[in-house]
Design a protein with these regions (language model features):
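C-terminal catalytic "cap/lid" subdomain
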Residues: 1-233
Length: 233
């Protein structure tokens, strides 16, 4: 199946489970608030350099013979621990088409689940939107969504308690400090760098914004400034 279709299906079934879980938890706490999932299409640039340098590993592990068959189909493959996996492009998000729907639902008092999996990557072809064979980095789409909503806070939840540099936990960074650490290569290009980069993009795109990265289990404390790594302009 095309990657864009896989993204759409993932958004649908994960959104279904997530919105029902959130709704159930709210009702258990005596809170009556509607929860909605929005199937979200995100525009990417045809000329994004990521399409010439795919980096996102997807799919199952393959044998050398299976990998060769994938390459004959025109797909990119990379060796990983003696096996092979497919890799695809991970372009930056340019625009979010359903942003007005998300805003309308928020204004109506709903909790909105949007841009799941980084959004469905699409390109404009006249009046149509054509799915792209790509996976958008979720951190960048989260930052784009928060920016377009003019949010004051971006909260990125992960398995880490804090970001680290040289093995030392980071409590707070300005955008300039974060950029310097990125330039010096302190963050892993696959796992932590996109999170820091996305946070810098968010806080520098507006005024009085804060981005926070921390452990999922600490969300309550993170939003109150007690834990995690905070990035400001």
């Amino acid at each position: 199946a095309p990657m864009s279709l896989c993204g759409a299906m993932s958004q649908g079934y994960i959104g279904y489970d997530l919105q029902n879980a959130v709704r159930s938890e709210l009702l258990n706490r005596g809170i009556f608030k509607p929860v909605s999932t929005v199937i979200t299409q995100v525009r990417v640039d045809l000329f994004d350099k990521a399409f010439n340098h795919p980096t996102k590993v997807i799919g199952r592990y393959m044998t050398a013979e299976e990998a060769e068959a994938e390459e004959e189909k025109g797909n990119h493959v990379v060796e990983e621990n003696g096996s092979y996996r497919r890799i695809i492009a991970s372009p930056r998000p340019v625009d979010i088409y359903e942003i007005d729907a998300v805003k309308a639902l928020i204004d109506a008092g709903q909790i909105v689940i949007a841009a799941g999996g980084g959004g469905i990557p699409v390109m404009e072809q006249g009046t149509k939107l054509k799915g792209a064979s790509a996976v958008i980095e979720k951190d960048y789409t989260a930052a784009k969504l928060a920016d377009m909503l003019d949010a004051s806070t971006l909260l990125i939840l992960t398995a880490r308690d804090q970001m680290e540099a040289d093995g030392k936990p980071i409590d707070a960074l300005t955008s300039e400090e974060a950029i310097q650490l990125m330039d010096e290569g302190h963050f892993d290009e696959i796992t932590t760098l996109p999170k820091i980069d996305a946070c810098v993009s968010f806080v520098t795109s507006g005024e009085e914004r804060t981005a926070i990265i921390g452990n999922l289990d600490d969300a309550y404390h993170l939003i109150r400034g007690r834990r995690g790594t905070r990035i400001t302009k």
